[in-house]
C-alpha cells in the first residue's frame, strides 16, 4: 500500500499551496474529460521513485466548536490513518496558541511528525523560527511553498525512510493480475468479490461501510493468478463527517495505485450519482484500466431498466472505451462475463509496440489527416515511441507538437485505439518538441573570419550588379 502523508495545520498557513507543490496538481489531471469535477484535497505524488498519497486535511483550530471538537470529530480519524504527518506553521505570523494546542495533540499519537515552517521568504528565518522550537517537534524545515523553495529538501527529509517503488515485473509474478473492486458503500462490492471467488471470503452485510479496510485476496482461476482488492466504502457527505469520507477515498486511491484493472461497481437501483463519477475520475487520474459493473440489475421493472440504460449512456459518454456490464452479484447473473473484459483491459493497458511500427501508424494518420497549422506553420510529427504501460503512453516527437489542439490529439488517440484494438484503458499521448541543438549557442567565428566573409559578400554583390547590366 502506498504510504499516506497528511498535511496538518491551522487555516491560512499555506497547506493547499504546499499540497500543489508536492502533487504538481494546480490543474486537474482529468480536465480533458468534460463534466468531470475533482476535489483537489488529495492526490498522488512521486519523488525520486517513491510514490505516496498526500492529503490536505483542512484548517484546524479556528472552527466554531474549538480545537478539541475538531480533533475529536474529524482530524483524529485522518491523522490516525496517516503514516507521516507534516505539521505546517506560518513563519510570518509566528507561534500562536492554536499551533501549540495542535502540537500537544499530535505528540500523543506516536506518529512520525515533521514540523514545516512555511512563508520563510521575506523574513529573517533564524529569528522567526526560534519560537517554534518550544513545540518540542525538532528543528523546523523551512519552505516558501508559493515559490517552491525548500520543497525538494523537505521531501528528501520526510521520505528518507520510505522505500523506493517495487519492480513492477517482480511484484506481478507474486500477485498475478491485481483487480480492485471499488464503489460507494452498499453497492455490492463484497458480494461481487464473493461471487468472483465462489465463496464467502468477505463479510457482507446490509449496513453501508461494513468492509473496514482494503482486503487483498489471492486466488487462481483457470490456471491464472489474481489478487482481488476489496476497498472500504466511500461514503456520501452528510452521512459521516468530511474527514472520514476523505480518507475512505484515500484507501480507494491506494487500492487503485496497486491494481492493474479497476472494476467500478454502481447501484442500478439508486442510479448514477456524482460520487460514482468521482470514483471514475480517480481511476482516470491513476491511469488505470477500467470495467464498469452496474449491479442489482435483478428485480427491476422494464421501465426502470430502460431509464437506467439511458442514464448510463448519458453519464458515461466521456469513457466510450470502457466496457459496461449489467450484473446481479447476488444471483451471479452476468458476473462471469466480467472476466473477458478484465483480461482485454489488462492486455490493452500493457501494450508494447516497437518505435518503427508506432511511427508508421503515426505517418499514415498524418497523411490521411494533416496536423493543423500554428502561427502560419504546420505542426510536424516526426516519430513516436512507447513511454510506458498502464496506461499505455505514446510519446510523439516533432516540431511545434506541443501546440497540438485537443481535437487532433483525440483523432490520434482514436487511430491508435482502432489499430491496436485498445479497450478498457485510457490512452496517454505526450508531445515532445524537437529542440534546435544550436539554439542559444554563441558563434565560434572570430572577427578576422567574419571580416573575410563580409568582403566575399560585398564582392558577390558587385559581380551580381555588373552581370545585370
UniProtKB/Swiss-Prot annotation:
Pfam families: KH_dom-like, MMR_HSR1
Binding-site list for GTP 2: 183-190, 230-234, 295-298
UniProt entry keywords in alphabetical sequence: GTP-binding, Nucleotide-binding, Repeat, Ribosome biogenesis
InterPro entries: G_ENGA, GTP-bd, GTPase_Der, KH_dom-like, KH_dom-like_a/b, P-loop_NTPase, Small_GTP-bd
CDD domains: EngA1, EngA2
UniProt record, GO biological process: ribosome biogenesis
Binding site for GTP 1: 9-16, 56-60, 118-121
Highest taxon of the lineage: Bacteria
GO terms for MF: GTP binding; ribosome binding
Domain KH-like: 351-435
Domain EngA-type G: 3-166, 177-350
Keyword match S-adenosyl-L-methionine: no
Gene3D superfamilies, alphabetized: 3.30.300.20, P-loop containing nucleotide triphosphate hydrolases
PANTHER family recorded: GTPASE DER (PTHR43834:SF6)
Oligomeric and partner information: Associates with the 50S ribosomal subunit.
Family from the record: Belongs to the TRAFAC class TrmE-Era-EngA-EngB-Septin-like GTPase superfamily. EngA (Der) GTPase family.
NCBIfam families (alphabetical): GTPase_EngA, small_GTP
Functional description taken from the UniProt entry: GTPase that plays an essential role in the late steps of ribosome biogenesis.
Name the record gives this protein: GTPase Der
